């Protein structure tokens, strides 16, 4: 009987671990990234740009609609969906298409390709503190690349399954992905013996809601250079305004 006890404990441990793993896998990627032709989300877009050689910050306001317009196949032969982005300058104006993207649900991940850059937006399991290299499929090391700031980002889940207010919407079930919050040599000092030579700031966060998809995005990337006492970079904020 004594010899059977270790085996029994091993069996219980195996069953316990299996149940724990199964529970973590219960939430499918499609819950937070539904891909159905005809589905759309409209956002208020605040676009930040630097003007006058980086000495002036300007904000441009638009509305954009991301609509799943067709199913397709990606370069790896996997089923994907074409996402068409439409834009207008006034809420009362007409939308005009201005870009297309590719979305792929692999069953365990959600990939989104824009401007030939493939981002690993979501992964299983949905668990607070879960981290992954969301930009690992992007070539940031080629000679002359201006994408080096995307290197080695750790995407991290936070507030999985929690309610959140986004714009005018009170959402019951969301997940926040903290993608980057990094700075170098800030604040910028523009005169004196300690004048800043170079400084950088990178911030990115996204929020997805169950049965809707992306509902909020905040992104900022800039670099300050003493050579021209100005900034290079851009930022965007997307806040959901409508969806079906």
Regions found by a protein language model. Give the residues of each.
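C-terminal motif of bacterial Sec signal peptides marking the signal peptidase cleavage site
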Residues: 13-16
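Conserved functional acidic sites
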Residues: 18-244
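Sec-dependent signal peptide hydrophobic core
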Residues: 5-9
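Positively charged n-region of N-terminal signal peptides that target proteins for export
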Residues: 1-4, 18-19
């Amino acid at each position: 009987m004594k010899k059977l006890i270790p085996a029994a404990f091993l069996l219980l441990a195996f069953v316990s671990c299996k149940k724990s793993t199964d529970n973590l896998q219960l939430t499918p990627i499609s819950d937070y990234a539904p891909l159905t032709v005809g589905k759309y989300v409209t956002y208020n877009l605040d676009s930040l740009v630097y003007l006058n050689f980086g000495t002036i910050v300007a904000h441009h306001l638009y509305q954009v609609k991301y609509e799943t317009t067709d199913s397709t196949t990606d370069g790896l032969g996997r089923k994907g969906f074409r996402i068409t982005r439409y834009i207008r300058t006034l809420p009362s104006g007409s939308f005009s298409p201005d870009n297309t993207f590719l979305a792929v649900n692999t069953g365990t991940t959600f990939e989104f390709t824009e401007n030939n850059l493939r981002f690993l937006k979501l992964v299983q399991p949905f668990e607070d503190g879960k981290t992954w290299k969301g930009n690992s499929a992007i070539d940031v090391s080629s000679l002359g690349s201006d994408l080096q700031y995307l290197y080695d980002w750790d995407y991290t889940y936070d507030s999985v399954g929690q309610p959140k207010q986004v714009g005018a919407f009170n959402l019951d079930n969301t997940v926040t992905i903290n993608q980057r919050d990094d700075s170098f040599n800030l604040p910028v000092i523009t005169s004196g013996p300690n004048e800043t030579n170079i400084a950088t700031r990178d911030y990115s966060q996204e929020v997805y809601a169950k049965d809707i998809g992306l509902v909020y995005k905040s992104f900022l990337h800039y670099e300050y250079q003493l050579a021209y006492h100005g900034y290079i970079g851009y930022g965007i904020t997307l806040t959901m305004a409508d969806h079906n």
